[in-house]
């Protein structure tokens, strides 16, 4: 009887110790990027078609390849009066070195800027000056009304700044341009 009690007690001790073991650690939480980080891009090893989701509230793009998260980027979308429209789009055209046909700056005869945020429909350059159309490098057209994604300044990350386009950090635009194709889906949400 004593042996049975010992065996039962030993079994109970093993059972209790087994249940009291430390549970597995939860998966690590994503580490927020260092301040000033404008994008993260990790497409290596991912296979499949790209897709992009742009959130107008957070001014951030999420990029997927084959349904797997490949990276994110801050963006600058349309400022008040030039609001970027939510909806489902596809990339219609890709041009490495594109310039706006409406917006830019006026300069005098010496090349000094007279008006920095000029509209060619209403802002004429001074005599001897000219209109310099804004560069939109790595242009990825979303509409035939002049809206697309391209490299450009992000003056205040998290805030709107453009005339309706989706600006990407200048360093990131060529990397994204390389991965997308005509027909890549782009969803813009509020």
Feature locations, PLM:
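A short, compositionally biased
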Residues: 54-60, 134-136
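N-terminal post-signal-peptidase region of extra-cytosolic proteins
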Residues: 34-51, 56-57, 71-90, 102, ...
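Bacterial Sec signal peptide processing site at the extreme N-terminus
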Residues: 17-38
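Exported/periplasmic cell-wall-interacting domains
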Residues: 19, 24-26, 79-86, 105-190
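Short acidic, Gly/Pro-enriched loop/turn segments at secondary-structure junctions
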Residues: 98-105
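Bacterial N-terminal signal peptides
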Residues: 7-18
């Amino acid at each position: 009887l004593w042996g049975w009690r010992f065996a039962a007690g030993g079994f109970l001790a093993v059972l209790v110790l087994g249940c009291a073991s430390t549970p597995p650690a939860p998966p690590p939480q994503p580490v927020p990027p260092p301040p000033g980080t404008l994008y993260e891009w990790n497409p290596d090893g991912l296979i499949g078609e790209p897709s992009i989701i742009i959130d107008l509230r957070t001014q951030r793009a999420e990029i997927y390849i084959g349904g797997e998260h490949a990276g994110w980027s801050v963006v600058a979308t349309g400022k008040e009066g030039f609001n970027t429209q939510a909806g489902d789009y596809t990339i219609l055209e890709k041009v490495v070195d594109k310039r706006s046909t409406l917006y830019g700056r006026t300069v005098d005869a010496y090349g000094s800027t007279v008006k920095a945020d000029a509209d060619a429909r209403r802002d004429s350059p001074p005599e001897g000056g000219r209109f310099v159309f804004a560069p939109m490098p790595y242009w990825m057209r979303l509409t035939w009304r002049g809206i697309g994604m391209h490299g450009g300044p992000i003056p205040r990350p998290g805030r709107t700044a453009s005339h309706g386009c989706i600006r990407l950090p200048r360093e990131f635009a060529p990397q994204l341009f390389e991965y997308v194709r005509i027909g890549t889906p782009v969803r813009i949400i509020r």
